[in-house]
Each structure stands twice: as C-alpha cells, then as structure tokens.
From Swiss-Prot:
It comes from the Eukaryota. This is Ubiquitin-ribosomal protein eL40 fusion protein. One of its GO terms (biological process) is translation. Residues 110-129 are annotated as: Disordered. One of its GO terms (molecular function) is structural constituent of ribosome. PANTHER family: UBIQUITIN (PTHR10666).
Length: 129
C-alpha cells in the first residue's frame, strides 16, 4: 500500500509499505529517500507520536494515509573538548566588585565608567559541578 509523509517544509514523500511494517522500517525508508537518520525522525499520525516497535496496523494507518515528519530536537550536552575551551574563556575572568562587569583575566581596572574604573576586581567564581 502507499502512504504519504509530509515534512515541515511542506514536501510530501510517497512510500510503499505493508500494514505489518514497523515504524522503524518506515523511518529507514524515509532515510533512504531523504537521508535523515532515523534517530532524528519523529512521525506523527492523528496527533500521536508513533513508537518504533509498533506496526502501521497498530495505529490503524491505511492506504493513502498521511504521516507528519518532525525532526527531533537535539542538545543538552557539550563535547568534553568544547567544554574545556568554554571554561577557559568563560570561567577564568575577573569581575568588578562595584558594577559586576566581566573583565579579561589580566585586567587591573574595570573598563566601565559607571564605577569610576575601579581597581576592586575579584576572580569569577567557579561553577558548581
């Protein structure tokens, strides 16, 4: 049978599937056509997100049904080498005790006028792990 997959860009993909096909199989077919890895795909039908282990017939998906493809949001973790680089630039700074401006590590006076270019600087506190 034939089903349609509509992307967020409005593009419609046609797939030839069987009712016994799993959602994983459908995602693999989408990867073959579009090059989107299955772990980044979320398929929606009738307002429900489809789970990988289930079949098309479990969701009552029939011929010429339309599934909606949404890409999974990624984030939340930083590669260790990038975290080290970020800590070097963000954590080894000095802070003005009067205006709380962030200053370079070797600064001796604040660069802001509002605190009168004070020399009262402290090292930035280390983040709690």
């Amino acid at each position: 049978m034939q089903i349609f997959v509509k992307t967020l860009t409005g593009k419609t993909i046609t797939l030839d599937v069987e009712p016994s096909d799993t959602i994983e199989n459908v995602k693999a077919k989408i990867q073959d056509k579009e090059g989107i890895p299955p772990d980044q795909q979320r398929l929606i039908f009738a307002g429900k997100q489809l789970e990988d282990g289930r079949t098309l017939s479990d969701y009552n998906i029939q011929k010429e049904s339309t599934l909606h493809l949404v890409l999974r949001l990624r984030g939340g973790i930083i590669e260790p080498s990038l975290a080290l680089l970020a800590s070097k630039y963000n954590c080894e700074k000095k802070i003005c005790r009067k205006c709380y401006a962030r200053l370079p590590p070797r600064a001796t006076n604040c660069r802001k006028k509002k605190c009168g270019h004070t020399s009262q600087l402290r090292p930035k506190k280390k983040p709690k792990n």
